[in-house]
A protein has these predicted regions:
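Substrate-binding groove/exosite segments of carbohydrate-active enzymes
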Residues: 40-85, 282-300, 306, 313, ...
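Carbohydrate-active enzyme catalytic cores, enriched for enzymes
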Residues: 582-588, 600-670
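Hydrophobic, small-residue-rich alpha-helical packing segments that form membrane-like cores
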Residues: 548-549, 553-588, 596-604
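Extended, loop-rich substrate-binding clefts of extracytoplasmic carbohydrate-active enzymes
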Residues: 112-176, 266-303
Length: 670
């Protein structure tokens, strides 16, 4: 199977999850639904909230704003929303033959309202000229920006990306952002052009007062005969410190100017001196020596590429921003076993520093670019409606953010979501990650690593599966009740991973724990060691104690509540797990179990229809504990209880009592 064929296969699999758009009640006409259309383009005030993540799998990212600005540096192993990096920008100088030169920051002009506690920060250079308008188009993994301004005599476009190559997490896990500036001379005369990238060394380390601050930051100019650019580090702090690491920004162009540090002055002098120098003739004074910054200060460095364009000529100027911050810390858990524990990023096994990353990226740039482009073209040149392509591609971008991480043992982990400065709801939450499909189809080896963690570490012999993972892994677990939808969904996901890979040996390795997790539904906790007695406290009774294929016990679920009684939310996942296990048991030679699961599945399928289908939709039957007084506003009229059997104050005992006078109704439509 060719690379293109593989991408088409995975594309179809991923897009299959979007088929729901075409089902149900018809809200749009068919011609509108099936209209391919073009990818959305954003301009004007719509650019304000665009944040396009660029980074590798589990490496962190930078975000490119809709105006062309670098919005955030999220490269230090946690989110960093809303913190625009100081003095970090691209700029252009152009001189058309016989005319006055023009210099601008390569961004659209700022968008009102100009809100900040003391106005727009000076380190974002709000007073420096920018382009009149921008058009941003997101075709993940590529972000495309077009800048327009009548004062600028060249056409300016940006293509920004990070390698995104399905089936290759190694090539898709590079801590880098690539900026290809495409400059075209549409005039009839020659033009001179300079493109510069400036960046403040952003590394903050612990000072003598144990506060994160600048100090002893070092910017080094390196020309290794292959690439030229700046490597940024700090000489303050220990090698194993969380802040320890480096950045680099480089180019393959030969004609460059460089400054390892801007003028060291007070107030606004550094930016003022730089802009006067740059805007004068498109060149800057070369400063290539290295000198540590003072305590409490850091330095801005610049790499400038200068060139000429004949009429009609176009040139691509590449810049590569790379980073290397290998040390992570568990800041998100309160459990003493893991709180503050340190571990390393997977990319630290492949690279030694940010310059090493840049060298690898550029040596392999053609292959990495073309393979990324193939995936992009298969997706965006397909006949799926544009809104489906937009939804699927934009969601895939989550894999290139701090939502996920890859530990140095190769295992993959993910939060439920992100706040502005931290991960939210750790880690590998089984019911939330039930919704996720992209990883399994595009990077299946990483998805399989998550199943291995779920079953080989987080599932006990009795089948009790904890639904959050504590990392680093160890002889400790998150001591909460098991999650019915997450546990059953996880079994279905093992089935999915087995089907996608065809690796029955992998399935055999997981099968004992998969079987235990399924049968936990009717066996429950059982006898456990003293150190696991908390399991009995978390779940008193099994989900399906009479083994009839219907869950009616306490079912913790993704709504962070408990269901009591039969329902098709957890019930459908239970049936799916049974059906999947019928086939998996057969594949591993466990035919007796295969037959047993099939009997339970068929019984449960009939029972759910019999109990919950009212002729129009499925309802939920809520088993109310004996003696519990149901609030008046939740009581139904007695005549509404005809399809409902609840354990209420006046109902007899048994699993499903007779209709109650105090009967709680909850309708769930599918």
């Amino acid at each position: 199977m060719s690379t293109r064929q593989r991408y088409i296969f995975f594309l179809c699999a991923v897009l299959a999850i979007s088929n729901f758009i075409f089902g149900g009640e018809q809200l749009y006409k068919k011609d509108k639904l099936y209209e391919t259309g073009k990818v959305r383009e954003f301009f004007g005030k719509d650019l304000r909230t665009i944040a396009f993540p660029i980074g590798g799998l589990g490496t962190g990212n930078i975000t490119l704003g809709g105006r062309g600005e670098i919005r955030e540096l999220e490269i230090f192993n946690r989110p960093n929303k809303g913190n625009y990096p100081d003095l970090t920008f691209f700029s252009i100088w152009v001189e058309e033959e016989g005319k006055k030169s023009v210099a601008k920051i390569l961004e659209r002009k700022l968008i009102s309202p100009y809100v900040a506690w003391m106005g727009i920060p000076r380190n974002q250079l709000p007073g420096v000229s920018r382009f009149e308008e921008a058009i941003f188009k997101g075709e993940y993994p590529f972000g495309y920006l077009t800048l327009t301004d009548n004062e600028v005599p060249v056409a300016v476009r940006l293509e920004a990306y990070n390698p995104f190559i399905p089936l290759s997490p190694e090539k898709s896990g590079i801590p880098a952002a690539v900026f290809n500036w495409k400059i075209k001379n549409d005039k009839k005369s020659k033009v001179k052009v300079s493109i510069a990238f400036s960046m403040l060394n952003p590394i903050k380390t612990l000072d003598k007062n144990k506060r994160h601050s600048y100090g002893k930051n070092l910017n080094q100019f390196i020309d290794d005969g292959f690439i030229k650019g700046i490597k940024m580090t700090s000489n303050r702090g220990e090698t194993e410190a969380l802040e320890s690491g480096s950045l680099a920004f480089v180019t393959t162009e030969k004609n460059i100017d460089v400054q390892t540090r801007w003028y060291r002055g007070g107030w606004w002098d550094n930016a003022h001196v730089f802009w006067d120098d740059f805007s004068d003739d498109g060149r800057i004074k070369n400063v290539s020596d290295s000198e540590e910054s003072m305590e409490g200060r850091s330095d801005v460095a610049t790499v400038l590429v200068h060139f000429e364009l004949d009429p009609g000529e176009e040139k691509v100027i590449p810049f590569y921003l790379t980073w290397y911050f290998p040390n992570r810390e568990n800041y998100w858990n309160r459990e003493k076993e893991v709180r503050g524990k340190k571990f390393k990023n997977y990319y630290s096994l492949k690279f030694q520093n940010a310059w090493d990353v840049a060298s690898y990226l550029i040596k392999n740039k053609e292959e990495l670019y073309q393979d990324t482009k193939v995936f992009h073209d298969v997706l965006f040149h397909s006949t799926y409606p544009s809104y489906v392509i937009d939804a699927v591609s934009s969601q895939a971008s989550s894999l290139k953010t701090n939502l996920v991480m890859r530990k140095d043992n190769g295992k993959f982990f993910g939060f439920e979501g992100l706040t502005d400065d931290s991960g939210c709801c750790p880690m590998n939450c089984t019911h939330v990650w039930n919704y996720e499909q992209t990883l399994a189809y595009l990077f299946p080896s990483l998805e399989r690593s998550m199943r291995e963690t779920d079953f080989l570490h987080n599932t006990f012999k009795n089948g009790y599966q904890v639904f959050r993972t504590l990392i680093p892994l160890g002889d400790y677990w998150w001591p909460f009740k098991p999650c019915a939808d997450g546990q059953m969904g996880n079994i279905v996901r093992v089935y999915r991973e087995w089907k996608l890979s065809g690796d029955t040996e992998w399935l055999k390795k997981l099968w004992p724990k998969v079987k235990a997790a399924l049968e936990f539904a009717w066996k429950g906790v059982g006898d456990v060691d003293k150190k696991l007695i908390w399991q009995k406290e978390r779940l008193l009774l099994p989900w399906d104690p009479d083994k009839d294929g219907v869950m009616e016990g306490e079912q913790h679920n993704t709504y962070d509540i408990e269901f009591y009684g039969p329902n098709t939310m957890t019930g459908s996942l239970y049936l799916a797990a049974l059906k999947a296990s019928v086939e998996m048991a057969e594949a591993v030679g466990d035919r007796k179990k295969s037959k047993e699961y099939l009997i339970i599945y068929e019984k449960g399928s009939k029972e759910y229809d019999s109990l919950l289908w009212n002729g129009e939709y499925y309802i939920q039957k809520v088993n109310v504990m004996e003696g519990l007084v149901v609030p008046e506003h939740l009581r139904s009229l007695e005549k509404d209880c005809e399809n409902l059997s609840c354990k209420g104050k006046d109902s007899p005992g048994g699993k499903m009592g007779a209709p109650s006078k105090a009967c709680l109704i909850q309708l769930v439509t599918l």
